[in-house]
Structures are given as C-alpha cells and as structure tokens.
Amino acid sequence: MDKLHVGITPWDFSSLSAKNLADQAVFVEDLGYDSFWLPENHFGENAIPDPLTLLAAVSGVTSKIKLGTTSYLLTLRNPIQAAEQVAVLD
C-alpha cells in the first residue's frame, strides 16, 4: 500500500515573522509531516504578500519536509522572475 503524505499550513498567525513560521515548520517536521505550505495573501492582518521569502527562511532550518505555496498569484508577477524565484527556492 502507498504511503499517505500529510501536509500542513501554519496554525499560529499571531506573528507572521520568519522565525515563528520556521519554528512551526521545524515542529511539524519533527512530528513526521511531509510538507509545510504557506498561502499568498495581500489583505488583512494575516497577510503573507511574499510566501517564497518566508519559505526560504523555513528551508534554512528544516531538512526533510517539503515546502510549497497553497496559492501564488502569478498574474501579479513577471513570469520569468517568478520562475527564477521558485527555481532558486527549490
């Protein structure tokens, strides 16, 4: 039987600092989750306007967990720059 892969998004939005999100990612990696996801959101108190920058911070403190965005608004970006940014993060 195939393995079930389980991912999670942040649950504590009291601080959207890179450190807080990285701490959450390390915690779920230690619990055995497979992936950690951030949304792109430009409005409200929980706005994350640049998830790739925060995921870069998360990648510096994790080693096994996969990282991704639940949404990434390509229509707001130059397609070449967006592709390069994602490639650098990979």
Q: Where are the predicted features?
A:
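Glycine-rich anion/phosphate-binding loops
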Residues: L16-N20, T75-V88
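Generic hydrophobic/packing signal
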Residues: T62, T69-S71, V86, D90
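N-terminal beta1-alpha1-beta2 module of alpha/beta enzyme domains
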Residues: M1-T62, K66-L67
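Glycine-rich "substrate-gating" loop/helix at the edge of Rossmann-like oxidoreductase active sites
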Residues: G44-N46, Y72-R77
